[in-house]
């Protein structure tokens, strides 16, 4: 097994080529969170601030050649639990989806239903000036404000604090 310091967290955390994440401070291997999408996640902390990372991306960033901006990580065998560096590769989103469809690991109709529901969910956008405005969907807000939908979604999920100075939250029912 090979270990490397996690970029941006040098001296705090390390990742192995097998998908383990180690805390130097505690001297322990950290337990992964596995949400409904099946991708292993890990929370890392530095300077009192926490950030969540997908384990397969950490492994690929540190052990797999070929990274370019915009590429995603593909599990060659389709098994999201297999985060060995030899099972991961950098591909385009299109190739990743094609691979998942050919393996039968992507439920297209379910993915479309989820995307449709999420895209129709009203959000509140807070401008850098603190002004709040409601939008019927993430898509509408992004189109009007010239924002990147993926980054806005990351803020809504708590993976980012803001995007281009804007913060976002889902509108509560009622």
From Swiss-Prot:
Task: Give the keywords, sorted.
Answer: Endonuclease, Hydrolase, Intron homing, Nuclease
- Organism domain of life: Viruses
Enzyme group, top EC level?
Answer: hydrolase
Q: What is its EC number?
A: 3.1.-.-
What terms describe the molecular function in GO for this protein? endonuclease activity
The record ties this protein, via SMART domains, to:
HNHc (SM00507), IENR1 (SM00497)
Entry-linked InterPro entries? His-Me_finger_sf (IPR044925), HNH_nuc (IPR003615), I-HmuI_NUMOD-like (IPR054307), Intron_nuc_1_rpt (IPR003647), NUMOD4 (IPR010902), WH-like_DNA-bd_sf (IPR036388)
Tell whether Hydrolase is among the UniProt keywords.
yes
The answer, when asked if Translocase is one of the entry's keywords, is no
Q: Which Gene3D superfamilies match?
A: 3.90.75.20, Winged helix-like DNA-binding domain superfamily/Winged helix DNA-binding domain (1.10.10.10)
GO BP of this protein = intron homing
Q: What is this protein called?
A: DNA endonuclease I-HmuI
What is the phylogenetic placement of the source species in the record?
A: Viruses, Duplodnaviria, Heunggongvirae, Uroviricota, Caudoviricetes
